[in-house]
Amino acid sequence: MSKSVINTDKAPAAIGTYSQAIRAGDTVYLSGQIPLDPGTMELVEGDFEAQTVRVFENLKAVVEAAGGSFADIVKLNIFLTDLAHFANGNECMGRYFAQPYPARAAIACASLPRGAQVEMDGILVLG
């Protein structure tokens, strides 16, 4: 099976040793996105909701670069530095996804890169 790198300048460049996404067959593995502005590579200003919207927009750019849409996402992992934001995260997610929703995990963690409050990665299947 061949694999190819998915890359777009509409999402933040990698800040480590990883690709924005990798396609293997019809499956695309999305690397974690934090709320960095793709133009400045700075963390977006604002509250948890502003950060979450930026993360979804970053993921959307990579998904579209892969030739897909959020309807193709089958698994989403959400990493939160504070589970008190769980309900707000659900509300934000509802703006981007319709039923049937992807499988999902919401995971509490002590900290995230660049002081972000939220990070997401996922898997989509094309075709």
From Swiss-Prot:
Top-level division of the source organism's lineage: Bacteria
Q: What molecular functions are annotated in GO for this chain? A: deaminase activity
InterPro entries linked to this entry: RidA, RidA_CS, RutC-like_sf, YjgF/YER057c/UK114
Q: Which GO terms describe its cellular component?
A: cytosol
- Could you say which residues form the signal peptide? none
- Family matches, as Pfam families: Ribonuc_L-PSP
User: Could you say which protein family the record assigns here?
Assistant: Belongs to the RutC family.
Record's protein name: RutC family protein in vnfA 5'region
